[in-house]
């Protein structure tokens, strides 16, 4: 009887730590995580009133959750570049250098992707001043 109790205790403890449908940590250097963080940074840049394009500096934290597809909760840092929104000179945002001494922002995005539908949606995107500054 004690052996059964011990086995049940271990199994219950294990199942609680691997909760189905729960958020799981992801590698911040994962290619998909960087792709989705870049997408969210680009969307924030479009919505901002800044004269300059903003781009991804680094991914701080990332989690995923299996739903009908996959939801990603990504925290990342963005900063303005030297590229003006109404200017020319760079073909790709990745080529734009960061604007020196400009404040960085820390952003959190919830992104939902359903690969079989080729569908990716930004469900939530919020940024605030306070990332590291170069």
Swiss-Prot record:
Tissue: Expressed by the venom gland.
Cystine connections: 83-96, 107-127
Signal peptide as annotated in the record: 1-17
Subcellular location: Secreted
Alphabetical list of CDD domains matching this protein: CY (cd00042)
Keywords tagged on the record: Disulfide bond, Protease inhibitor, Secreted, Signal, Thiol protease inhibitor
Main location: secreted
Motif segment (Secondary area of contact): 65-69
Family: Belongs to the cystatin family.
Name listed for the protein in its UniProt record: Cystatin-1
Organism of derivation: Chilobrachys guangxiensis (Chinese earth tiger tarantula)
Taxonomic lineage from the root: Eukaryota, Metazoa, Ecdysozoa, Arthropoda, Chelicerata
């Amino acid at each position: 009887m004690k052996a059964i109790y011990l086995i049940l205790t271990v199994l219950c403890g294990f199942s609680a730590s691997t909760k189905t449908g729960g958020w799981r940590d992801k590698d911040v250097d994962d290619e998909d995580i960087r792709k989705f963080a870049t997408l969210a940074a680009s969307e924030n840049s479009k919505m901002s009133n800044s004269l300059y394009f903003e781009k991804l500096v680094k991914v701080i934290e990332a989690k995923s959750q299996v739903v009908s597809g996959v939801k990603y909760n990504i925290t990342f840092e963005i900063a303005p570049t030297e590229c003006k929104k109404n200017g020319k000179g760079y073909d790709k945002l990745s080529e734009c250098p960061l604007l020196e001494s400009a404040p960085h922002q820390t952003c959190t995005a919830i992104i939902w992707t359903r690969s079989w539908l080729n569908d990716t949606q930004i469900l939530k995107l919020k940024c605030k001043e306070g990332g590291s500054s170069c």
